[in-house]
Amino acid sequence: MKKTIIASSLAVGLGVVAGNAGHADASEAQVNKAELAQLAQSNDQSLNDSPIQEGAYNVTFDYEGFTYHFESDGTNWSWNYAQSGQASQQQDVSAQASTVSNQTSAEQVGSQQQSSQAQPTQTQQAPQTEQTQQPQTEATTSNSSSSNNNASSGSSVNVNSHLQQIAQRESGGDITAINPSSGAAGKYQFLQSTWDSVAPDEYKGVSPAQAPEDVQDAAAVKLYNTAGASQWVTA
């Protein structure tokens, strides 16, 4: 998955602190690897809206079988991740491969709807996203076969063995678990935005940790079947 952004230089607080002004690489910055990895894996919109820190930086790190890269020249920024050692194959099994081109500067945001006041030499384009979904050809293993489906403890939902392993790694099977750092919650450690995309209407906007186990299981199965195991860093 690779994202390339051309937009404002506003930073979001994602746990990255520049070691020196201007340019920072992996050795010059203190990186919250777990949080950045979780945001990248879940295709969090905040990574597209703004860079992870102000100024130019070049941050690359490996985390749990994937290599992550975040880069900015101070104006344009990009981020991507791939399975370690298989960067060229990642696009083939990725649930989502998106390219975002945003040519709106911070000074132009307020005047996007006032085309009559645009400078003749400036071209303003609203952010556009092209998303391509590829079938999961390598990400899932034989563990996801129907012969291995079993209802999880305390739930009537059939959860395949791969998802059960993910739940154990993410939360130890605790349906009320909450990560105070990233805000991920529940048995499968959903981010709120991801949860809202797969949860039943009555549980949208509610913390996953407050939903019954069978509701969490059903949401996880839906996400697994539509987006693949790559949605979880521990997969």
Curated annotation (Swiss-Prot):
Primary site of residence: secreted
> What EC number(s) would the UniProt record show?
3.2.-.-
- Write out the biased-composition intervals (Polar residues): 99-110
Report the sequence similarity comment from the record.
Belongs to the transglycosylase family. SceD subfamily.
| Comp. bias regions, Low complexity | 111-159
This protein's record includes keyword Metal-binding: no
List the InterPro entries.
Answer: Lysozyme-like_dom_sf, RPF
- The molecule here is called Probable transglycosylase SceD
TM region positions: none
Q: Which Pfam families match?
A: Transglycosylas
Subcellular localization: Secreted
Tell me yes or no: is Secreted among this UniProt entry's keywords: yes
Q: What class of enzyme is it?
A: hydrolase
Q: Which organism is it from?
A: Staphylococcus haemolyticus (strain JCSC1435)
Xref: CDD domains? RPF
Q: What does this protein do?
A: Is able to cleave peptidoglycan and affects clumping and separation of bacterial cells.
Q: Which UniProt keywords apply?
A: Glycosidase, Hydrolase, Secreted, Signal
Cite a single GO MF annotation.
hydrolase activity, acting on glycosyl bonds
Signal sequence: where?
1-26
Q: Which Gene3D superfamilies match?
A: 1.10.530.10
Note down the stretches annotated as region Disordered.
90-159
Gene Ontology cellular-component terms listed: extracellular region
